[in-house]
Amino acid sequence: MNAAIRDKNIVLIGFMGVGKTTIGQLVSKKLGRDFIDIDHEIEKDFQMTIPEMFQQKGEAFFRQTEKEYIFQMCEHTMGNIVSLGGGAFQQEEIRKKCLEHCFVIFLDLRWENWKQRMDLLIENRPVLHNRTIEEMKQLFNERKSIYAFHHLKVETDNRSAEETADYIVEMLKLGQS
């Protein structure tokens, strides 16, 4: 693996439900690296779910907390596989920090394929609550333009989580971006 990549955290970005956590766990096992899910770390430390945090403390509090955790990860850890929440890259400061200090992989999925997963996602994704299908599609497209800032894009539409993880490991070993 390219030395420049080997010493960096590998950050997975993409829309909610694309498989960042599942794929990240698989990649971490294949590479023998630790896995960090930023949302899970926040939930563990605050002893509440992200939906509960949105409800009790508000989205602004969550986004600030998320930024602090991501900055901490970027500045003080190396060599991990890290899953960011789907909205994290909306914050320009987070984008810049991750792109500067980490190797960022965008897990892409077509709207039609994401829509098939939607019913499984809505309950645990507060930003989807009370949105129409048109509003969800708009959010999907807005975030997709933000995810354009990355080092490697991986299409997940025609791959299982295992196949996607294998592809990522192969690309990292080749040092391709």
From Swiss-Prot:
It is found in: Cytoplasm. Catalyzes the specific phosphorylation of the 3-hydroxyl group of shikimic acid using ATP as a cosubstrate. Substrate binds at residues 39, 63, 86, 143. Its EC number is 2.7.1.71. It comes from the Bacteria. HAMAP family: Shikimate_kinase. The gene is aroK. Binds 1 Mg(2+) ion per subunit. Belongs to the shikimate kinase family. It catalyses: shikimate + ATP = 3-phosphoshikimate + ADP + H(+). Its cofactor is Mg(2+). GO terms for molecular function: ATP binding; magnesium ion binding; shikimate kinase activity. It is an enzyme of class 2 (transferase). This is Shikimate kinase. It comes from Bacillus licheniformis (strain ATCC 14580 / DSM 13 / JCM 2505 / CCUG 7422 / NBRC 12200 / NCIMB 9375 / NCTC 10341 / NRRL NRS-1264 / Gibson 46). Mg(2+) binds at residue 21. InterPro entries: P-loop_NTPase (IPR027417), Shikimate/glucono_kinase (IPR031322), Shikimate_kinase/TSH1 (IPR000623), Shikimate_kinase_CS (IPR023000). Monomer. Keywords: Amino-acid biosynthesis, Aromatic amino acid biosynthesis, ATP-binding, Cytoplasm, Kinase, Magnesium, Metal-binding, Nucleotide-binding, Transferase. GO terms for biological process: amino acid biosynthetic process; aromatic amino acid family biosynthetic process; chorismate biosynthetic process. ATP binds at residues 17-22, 125, 159. Pathway: Metabolic intermediate biosynthesis; chorismate biosynthesis; chorismate from D-erythrose 4-phosphate and phosphoenolpyruvate: step 5/7. One of its GO terms (cellular component) is cytosol.
